[in-house]
Amino acid sequence: MNFHTKYWNPFIETMPLEELRELQLKKFKRALLWAYSNSPFYRRIYKEAGLEPGDIKTHKDIRCVPKVEKDMLREVQTREPFPYGDILSVPLKEVTTFRQTSGTTGTPVYHADSWQDMEWYSETWAYVLYAQGYRETDRVFIPFGYNIFVAFWGAHFAAEKIGCEVVPGGVLDTQARILKMKELHCTAFMATPTYVLGMADTAARKLGIDVSKELSIQRITCAGEPGACIPTTKRRMEGAWGAKVYDHIGATESGAWSYECMEQPGGLHVNEAFFLVEIEDLETGEITDDPKKPGKMIITALDRSAKPCIRFDSKDVIRWSGQPCNCGRTFRLTDGGVMGRADDITKVKGVLLAPTAIEEVVRSLSDLGNEYEVLVTKKGDLDDILLKVELLPGKEGEEKGVLAHLKDQLRLRTNLGYQIEVHPYGSLPRYELKAKRFKDLRMKGA
């Protein structure tokens, strides 16, 4: 690739829209035929729907292809052959890598990749990192456990592909990671938004280190949670580290489907060379291209071979921006990041509530700590929302005013009232991977 441009692949990333749509349709047809011909699972659901690969001739025809739900993926892996069931499109002997989902929404889903898939996966991530300014001069620290979750495996290989020097910090604890980043003058790292904030907090409280002044970090890539596209959370992270923070959203089932570029346009580019993203209206169930109208993301990985991902219902809620980006890429932009999961965006007291709205308010108050927890319960016939927060040390005397302001902002942002508990600083749960701060306990009889 040309390291003197701002694009990893200038030809693809600036391709005229009509040509890009033609490329996606061609790839979708190829992926559908591959799955139909080689995966008993996909062939079964397509035959049940009366669908033949040759039926797909236009982008609109794609909407007739049955969606795949996560529960379907869980069910198929209970079948023979172990451990994936009959979903694979390659012989088991061609599988080189096992991954699984984190299990935060239920039984983990197993995922298989071939060596060809892993090369593709690193290429999709190279688009992400290069757009965020990673170059061969960077020393990149990756502070994740290198375990069975996909997390930053692809990012590691992509950083190497770009030419970066990669420091794998998996076995180190948080304090050791910070010290190693300082020692090696690392210029970039990757983590969940929760862990980005947690590392800065640990550095200050346990090591007496101001990471914005004593480390050399210039850019941070976030994944796993919506936080890096929530303006107040992004500002906290950038303020704590004195670095640019970029969002990325992916999934084990699909791959690295989106990224924020260096322009930080307030949304994410869909990695359209490799993925087809559709948005399904939450109310009508129809596919919509209407900017500003949120819906569930239906995603197809256009080049995945071992375990195809065709029209997977991610349950992630996004919306199109409808605006171009100043970076010059023709890949479409979302408006903001992932707004939440369709499973989490729920009616409380008759009002639709997105957990990201609560995070945006909490993180906007400088007197509050980074951590919080939301519990939705039933008290008799009425819904009740309990929000647990932490005051920063030294702010105890300002508690009354802070909480009054917090309640006002929450009501303005969400049109709901909250019970608020203040907990000692450092007492709420801390997370390294995906944080589960929003808990709807109403269905559990709480």
Residue ranges and their predicted role:
Residues 35, 101-104, 140, 189, ...:
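Conserved S/T- and glycine-rich ATP-binding loop of Class I adenylate-forming
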Residues 222, 227-324:
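Conserved AMP-binding/adenylate-forming
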Residues 196-216, 235-238:
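Adenylate-forming
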Residues 1-100, 106-123, 130-131, 381-388, ...:
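Nucleotide 5′-phosphate-binding alpha/beta core
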Residues 139, 206-228:
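Conserved helix-loop-beta element of the AMP-binding
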Residues 189, 298, 303-414, 433:
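AMP-binding/adenylate-forming catalytic core of the ANL superfamily
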Residues 134-138:
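Short helix-loop-beta connector
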Residues 115-128, 139-198:
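AMP-binding/adenylate-forming
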